[in-house]
Regions:
Chain A
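Short hydrophobic, aromatic-rich alpha-helical segments embedded in or entering the lipid bilayer
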Residues: 49-81, 273-285
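Alpha-helical transmembrane segments of integral membrane proteins
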Residues: 2-7, 20, 98-135, 151, ...
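Individual transmembrane alpha-helix segments
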Residues: 67-111
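Membrane-water interface segments at transmembrane-helix boundaries in multipass membrane proteins
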Residues: 141-206
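Hydrophobic alpha-helical membrane-insertion segments
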Residues: 20-29, 145-162, 254-260
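Membrane-interfacial helix-loop-helix junctions in multi-pass membrane proteins
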Residues: 59-68, 85-90, 94, 176-193, ...
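N-terminal signal-anchor/signal peptide hydrophobic helix marking the start
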Residues: 10-16
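Hydrophobic alpha-helical transmembrane segments of membrane transport/permease proteins
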Residues: 20-70, 166-186
Length: 359, 256, 293
């Protein structure tokens, strides 16, 4: 644990020790607060067919008659054993649902993540290189507009243009109707992936473009770039060489830290495109009062986002050595409020109060 | 004698003017710097010393116009035949280790550059090559900046305020380093307001008063009360520096 | 009254950057007021179901066309925007208020400070939209649910910023003197902290607002937000899917464009205010500078 990333990992692990339990408590509390009767959600329309005794029996069987904190520890104990409970809406263990749906989400989010990074940082570099001229204005305006456009609206527009008017691409699902996973060709899969990835990645480029542009301009206008330019380095070389470390290094960090946003976008995108991933399951769980599934998904995404942030921190310190934690670096002891300051202040103010006549 | 004649950086009537103004900011300045010599450039704050360096490198702000003739061995002066050591250590790239920065500047050099040897030349350990700028002390950072100018292989160095913010011992060492470079045949234009250290290395000193070149004096003139200096401003500048020197050395012990 | 008018006019007509911000702010305030008032005052007949005029393309009579039930899209968009703006305003106000309280509490009390920073860290560590869904779910969805969801999830960044500002204020001499004179924390917060934090607070509100309405629309879109029978942008877009697949593109274009334009205006205003009132925030997790919401 002598290297800087070892110290970083230790620091982050210590954080996780209190962060994860606190998060689990918060999530569980939120789900338990919901004014939805789980029994009713489970039984659904047949509620009228069961009497109050049967209802109480089901509640007892699920442990719903117990106080909240007992239910929490019950849930936690099962969680530690890898049991996340049963999903009501999919009629299967939550873990199975998660494992089944994770690959589709991973494909969608992974492709979007990469596409957004390539396009976003490319446009950002271009904008910085043309600072103040029309390509820069165009790209900046574009970034601004998409960062305030509702992502799901962009998806609907794409469907309207590419799927309905032009009829180039499919608008629904991961595969053509009637084709099973085994029969499918990879290109069928790919064709269905295009529109969701386009939607999701466009949404992610907005902040990235602005960030890369800002960082690169900051470097190119800064003293060290000026110094290199004075000694004969060309602007292109400057932007692609030393500048890339300034711009892209932090771009990776920002992009990784925005994985949570990406997942949020995928919830909407998967709903619109009927993509069989975790996002679609989230909506189904939330609207179908499927508390165990909702909790499970929330936990998975929290872990993914934490990992993303950890990776972002490591990369940030790798790119910028000023962020590395050095062993000799000790936090200065916080200055205690000085008692004499208190006393003298009181004295001063008291004397002033005496002199000033009261009106 | 003829080679001496050939190797010189000559500036005639260098005048810097703010666009739309008739009064020049700096100049007209004229000087001639020979290889293996050091020309000092002094003046009060805001006299336009750093602008002169920018003018040599054709890197003036857009609103300043530059007139005059700058030649190197009678050919027009190219910025690429000189190297600048800037005033601020911000000029170091914060995200690159020293060795990598040396390589960036060495790209211009026709000869292969060994970073370790270069670091040794500015009296830095080879280990310093792996350090990032934020890990360097002020004196080390200045030496790295000097190493960067050497990496370019340029024969003409423009050194801007090398001792600013350094403590006296470190500043003296840096000046010592500059005289070694001078002895190796580099032509040095040394911009500083630290006249006392300047005359330890310079052969001639050019004095600016609010942008005007009032005098170019040989170092020998800076002696005693400055009787050898022609212009009253030069004398005042010299006396002021001497006056501050003495009380400072007396009081230094009492301060802490 | 006259003096107020005169000072407003003199501020708005300033030719510098600040004047530009004030003009934009005044313009956005007028737009929002008109929309909320206009959306509420629309006669019911404008939005009534009219089977004779189903799915008409935009024309002089129906500027933005009609939907599958023959309702005028322009009126519905306006009414939907009014609804979204109302929820957004309330949620953003609650959120910034929460941020203010949290920030001041953290600055004035050390143990509360620890609590607030852990809570902030935790909230920022969670995927934003999932948290929104969870809170909306906890409140059982609907207009109430979505308002609370947005209000309870958008405060952390602003709270972190206000906490930082308040902490430097608390360290200053005059606050320390007041404290040693026996003033209560409440008094300090009201007289020393709040007036100084006002600019950041207002800037924070404007920055949060567009996010609030966008997230409200997102939640309504997936069915966890505003009730389906009320006009709202999210619900309208969710219902437009079938009409759009049938080729009636105008049912999609109008509501989204309206929402985007309002959000765009506030984003621009927020950008200006942020530059003027908020210092660049350099978080440890590489959050882009100045990002508040």
């Amino acid at each position: 644990m002598n290297s800087w990333w070892g110290r970083l990992m230790m620091k982050r692990l210590c954080r996780l020790v209190w962060l994860l339990p606190l998060t689990a408590v918060l999530l569980f509390t939120l789900v338990s607060l919901a004014p939805i009767d789980p029994v009713q959600a489970y039984v659904g329309a047949r509620m009228s067919m069961i009497g109050p005794e049967q209802q109480a029996a089901i509640e007892a069987a699920w442990g719903l008659d117990q106080p909240g904190w007992i239910r929490f520890f019950h849930w936690l104990a099962h969680l530690v054993q890898g049991d996340l409970g049963d999903s009501i809406s999919y009629n299967a263990p939550v873990l199975t649902v998660l494992v089944e749906r994770f690959p589709a989400s991973l494909a969608l989010m992974g492709c979007s993540f990469l596409a957004a990074f390539v396009v976003g940082s490319g446009l950002g570099v271009l904008a910085a290189a043309c600072q103040g001229r029309w390509p820069d204005r165009l790209i900046r305006g574009w970034a601004m507009v998409i960062s305030v456009s509702p992502g799901f609206w962009i998806a609907l527009l794409f469907i309207s243009i590419f799927a309905v008017q032009l009829a180039w691409l499919p608008s629904c699902c991961a595969l053509p109707p009637g084709v099973t996973q085994d029969e499918a060709h990879w290109w069928q899969y790919g064709r269905h992936l295009v529109l969701p990835v386009l939607t999701l990645s466009i949404y992610g480029t907005g902040p990235l473009i602005l960030h890369v542009r800002q960082r690169l301009i900051g470097f190119l206008d800064g003293p060290s770039a000026r110094h290199l330019r004075l000694h004969g380095m060309s602007s292109t070389r400057l932007a692609l060489g030393p500048g890339s470390r300034h711009a892209l290094g932090s771009a990776v960090t920002v992009h990784l830290a925005s994985i949570g946003e990406l997942f949020g976008g995928s919830v909407l995108a998967e709903t619109i495109f009927a993509w069989p991933g975790l996002g679609q399951a989230t909506v189904k769980a939330a609207t179908g009062a499927d508390a165990p599934l909702l909790l499970g998904i929330a936990l998975v995404t929290v872990v993914v986002v934490l990992l993303g942030n950890l990776l972002a921190d490591i990369l940030a310190a790798w790119v910028d050595p000023r962020l590395r934690i050095m062993p000799q670096e000790e936090t200065l002891p916080r200055l205690k409020r000085l008692p004499w300051l208190k006393a003298s202040a009181r004295l001063k103010t008291a004397s002033r109060l005496k002199v000033e006549p009261k009106s | 004698m003829k080679t001496q004649q050939m190797m010189s950086l000559q500036v005639e009537a260098l005048t810097l003017t703010m666009k739309g103004h008739s009064q020049p900011l700096v100049g007209p300045l004229s000087w001639r710097l020979e290889a293996g010599q050091c020309m000092g450039l002094v003046g009060g704050s805001g006299a336009g010393k750093s602008l002169v360096a920018d003018a040599l490198f054709q890197a003036l702000p857009a609103e300043i116009e530059c007139q005059g003739r700058m030649t190197l061995n009678d050919a027009p002066l190219s910025p690429l035949s000189m190297a600048l050591m800037p005033q601020s250590i911000e000029a170091l790239d914060p995200l690159a280790p020293v060795t990598q920065q040396i390589r960036r500047f060495a790209r211009r050099n026709a000869e292969a550059v060994d970073p370790t040897r270069l670091l040794a030349q500015v009296q830095l350990e080879a280990e310093a090559g792996a350090l990032f700028p934020h890990q360097l002390s002020g004196g080390m950072a200045r030496r790295v900046l000097l190493a960067l100018t050497l990496a370019t292989g340029a024969d003409w160095l423009v050194i801007d305020e090398p001792t600013l913010g350094l403590d006296p011992t470190v500043a003296d060492q840096l000046i010592q380093l500059l005289s070694t470079l001078k002895a190796q045949g580099k032509g040095v234009l040394l911009i500083s307001h630290d006249l006392v250290r300047l005359i330890q290395v310079a052969d001639e000193v050019m004095i600016l008063a609010s942008g005007q070149q009032v005098e170019t004096a040989p170092v020998a003139a800076f002696d005693g009360s400055g009787g050898g200096l022609k212009h009253p401003f030069s004398r005042a500048l010299w006396q002021a520096q001497q006056w501050t020197q003495n009380p400072l050395t007396i009081h230094q012990g009492d301060e802490r | 009254m006259k003096r107020v008018m005169v000072s407003i006019v003199s501020i708005v007509t300033r030719s510098d950057d600040t004047g530009k911000s004030y003009r934009l702010a005044l313009f956005m305030a007028i737009v929002v007021t008109l929309m909320i008032w206009g959306g509420g005052a629309l006669p019911d007949t404008m939005m009534a179901v009219n089977p004779a005029q189903r799915s008409l393309a935009p024309s002089w009579q129906h500027w933005l066309g009609t939907d599958l039930l023959g309702r005028d899209m322009a009126s519905r968009t306006l009414a939907g925007l009014a609804q979204s703006l109302k929820v957004g305003l309330l949620a953003a106000a609650l959120s910034t208020l929460l941020a203010m309280v949290m920030g001041m509490m953290a600055a004035l009390n050390r143990s509360l400070d620890r609590l607030v920073s852990s809570l902030t860290d935790m909230m920022l560590g969670m995927p934003h939209f999932v948290l929104l869904i969870m809170v909306a779910y906890a409140f059982g969805g609907g207009t109430v649910g979505v308002t609370w969801a947005v209000a309870l999830t958008h405060w952390p960044r602003l709270a972190r910023l206000l906490r930082h500002e308040a902490k430097t204020l608390v360290k200053s001499d005059y606050v320390q003197v007041s404290r040693s004179l026996g003033r209560s924390n409440l008094w300090l917060a009201r007289h020393h902290l709040m007036p100084h934090l006002m600019p950041q607070w207002i800037a924070g509100f404007v920055v949060i607002f567009p996010h609030a309405i966008l997230h409200e629309a997102g939640l309504s879109f997936i069915g966890l937000g505003i009730e389906p029978h009320l006009p709202s942008i999210g619900v309208m877009l969710a219902n437009s899917l079938n009409a759009m697949l049938a080729g009636f593109w105008w049912v999609v274009l109008a509501p989204g464009l309206g929402l985007m334009l309002v959000a765009f205006g506030f984003e621009r205003l927020g950008e200006r205010l942020r530059r003027q009132a908020l210092p660049p925030d350099r978080g440890s997790s590489g959050v882009s500078p100045g990002q508040v919401a």
